[in-house]
Design a protein with these regions (language model features):
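Active-site neighborhoods and metal-handling regions in enzymes and metal-associated proteins
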Residues: 1-354
Length: 354
């Protein structure tokens, strides 16, 4: 089934049209990425609106939609209302998670159809990947693995976190990345206790841990990985914590397969860390799904009481963070299968000393 057909399957007498405003839903439905635009989906026709900066690309790349230009400065309202009239739409399902209050107020005031929140339905399909999507994600992760191998010998005592971040970004693009899936996290020494720390002017020192969390975009799909490496040497405590995190990740991976409740996967990994006495230092979830966005649903974390579906792609990233001392996180990306997972991150997970 084509992605657009999945959207059409949502339509009924109660919701007879969809308003796609997020880049991600438009990309999914049209199977082509345009950064600016709006699309209307109905059983009587589908239209995609974008401005002069993107119209040629849209006309050449988008399939299944009639592509029409809009004036960049006057917006989408007239085009949407024309579609509402031409297709006889009475109720538009919209993505409430991707609209500002101002945008929603404008649509409610000016559109000639009833608007109903429909984000869960519109974006629910993305939790299960088609094989062609998985191939793109495997390629994205392959690029990320190559970048990690390339950046390791570039880590030097005396360089700043920002300098290492620049080297990492270069390696990501050099190996085929078409964009960054998020701003890389590069932290060192005591800054590694900050799960989402920001690279700064701190200079890397002998005996530091360095944590790098990074990913690329490939044909619109994200990769994600984290590795913590030691510079010069690692203390016994550093080695101990690293091994606990590695064991927790393995426990989470072993617990993951289609049908297992998301929070139970988290619990399997969390138990290893808690039993080792570090439970209070693991504050975030075990993982998250990813695809067109770096954070999607469903998630293998404590807040998910639902089973993980076959074909979901999710991260496995437990961590321990000791304030003022150091932190460790190890992250791989996995594809959920019937009897386990396919780990598409291929970089080594043993403690690397550079």
């Amino acid at each position: 089934m084509k992605n657009l057909d999945k959207y059409l399957s949502l339509l009924n007498e109660e919701v007879d049209g969809l308003l796609l405003t997020s880049r991600y839903s438009r990309h999914y439905g049209a199977e082509f990425d345009i950064s600016e635009g709006v699309a209307v989906v109905s059983k009587k026709g589908c239209r995609y609106f974008t401005d002069s900066r993107y119209i040629e690309s849209a006309e050449n790349g988008i399939k299944g939609f009639e592509v029409l230009p809009i004036n960049q400065f006057t917006g989408f309202i007239k085009r949407i209302n024309d579609a509402i009239a031409d297709f006889g739409i009475h109720t538009l399902g919209f993505e409430e998670n991707y609209l500002t209050v101002g945008e929603l107020m404008s649509y409610e005031k000016n559109l000639n159809a009833k608007l109903v929140p429909f984000n869960k339905e519109i974006n629910g399909f993305r939790g299960v990947k088609e094989e062609w999507e998985l191939d793109r994600m495997r390629k994205a992760q392959e690029i990320t693995d190559k970048a990690f191998a390339d950046v390791l010998p570039r880590i030097k005592v005396g360089m700043t976190e920002l300098e290492l971040q620049a080297e990492l970004i270069y390696c990501l693009y050099k190996n085929g990345g078409q964009g960054l899936s998020f701003d890389p996290i590069v932290v060192s020494g005591p800054n590694t206790s900050l799960p989402h720390g920001v690279a700064g002017e701190r200079k890397i020192q002998e005996g530091d841990f360095v944590t790098m969390d990074f990913g690329v975009l490939y044909q619109g799909y994200c990769s994600d990985m984290t590795r913590t490496v030691a510079v010069g040497y690692a203390t016994e405590e550093m080695k101990k914590v690293y091994e606990i995190v590695a064991a927790a990740q393995l426990a989470g991976i072993a617990a993951t397969k289609a049908g297992v409740i998301g929070k139970e996967i988290d619990a399997a990994a969390r138990k290893v860390i808690t039993d080792a006495g570090y439970g209070e230092y693991f504050g975030h979830g075990y993982g998250h799904s990813l695809g067109l966005e770096i954070h999607e649903a469903p998630n293998p974390n404590p807040g998910n009481p639902n089973p993980m579906p076959l074909g979901a792609v999710c991260s496995a990233e437990p961590g321990i963070y000791l304030p003022g001392k150091f932190g460790v996180r190890i992250e791989d990306v996995t594809i959920v299968g019937e009897n386990g997972v396919e780990i598409i991150t291929k970089s080594p997970k043993n403690l690397i000393i550079v």
